[in-house]
């Protein structure tokens, strides 16, 4: 009897050790199909426009568009883009650094790559002349979550905005289609 109990207990512990949690966006697991994800985001108050295939609403205090991106009809990434990319260089640096601090100070995440921007950084010059990309990426402290949260500065006609991504790396393209 002890032996059977030990085997059952060992099997349960082994399964738990290999189970993986899924990255979430607004508490919604990034998995399943696109229609389900859009429906769940609409339940959170976002509005879906079928013509543009985008949702709109507020995220982290900013009006944004949200794109649900799939691979083989499985959701793998949520892309968030500022609705109005109208920040000047000073304000986008402040916003970039604020996001960096928010993610760095969140107990769920750890920095994978990137750093805060210095006040003296001339992002306009660096982006145009040297094609520099300003981004930061964070992984999960809980290693059972195979996901990535990252963001970058986007420039359009001298105005700036933030592009942010929540990625379920288990659902990302892995070359199976090649």
Indicate residue ranges for each PLM-predicted region.
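Non-cytosolic coordination micro-motifs
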Residues: 20-53, 83-178
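N-terminal, post-signal-peptide region of Sec/Tat-exported proteins
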Residues: 41-81
């Amino acid at each position: 009897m002890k032996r059977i109990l030990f085997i059952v207990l060992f099997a349960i512990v082994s399964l738990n050790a290999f189970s993986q949690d899924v990255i979430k966006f607004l508490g919604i697991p990034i998995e399943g199909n696109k229609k389900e994800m859009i429906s769940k985001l609409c339940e959170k108050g976002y509005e879906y426009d079928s013509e543009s295939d985008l949702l709109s609403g507020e995220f982290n205090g900013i009006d944004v568009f949200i794109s649900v991106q799939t691979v083989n009809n499985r959701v793998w990434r949520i892309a968030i883009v500022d609705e109005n990319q109208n920040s000047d260089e000073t304000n986008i640096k402040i916003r970039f650094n604020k996001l960096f601090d928010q993610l760095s100070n969140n107990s769920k995440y750890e920095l994978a790559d990137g750093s805060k921007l210095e006040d003296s950084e001339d992002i306009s010059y660096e982006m145009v002349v040297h094609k520099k990309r300003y981004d930061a990426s964070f992984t999960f402290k809980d290693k059972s979550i195979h996901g990535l949260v990252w963001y970058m500065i986007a420039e359009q006609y001298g105005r700036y905005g933030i592009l942010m991504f929540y990625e379920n790396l288990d659902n990302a393209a892995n070359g199976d289609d090649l």
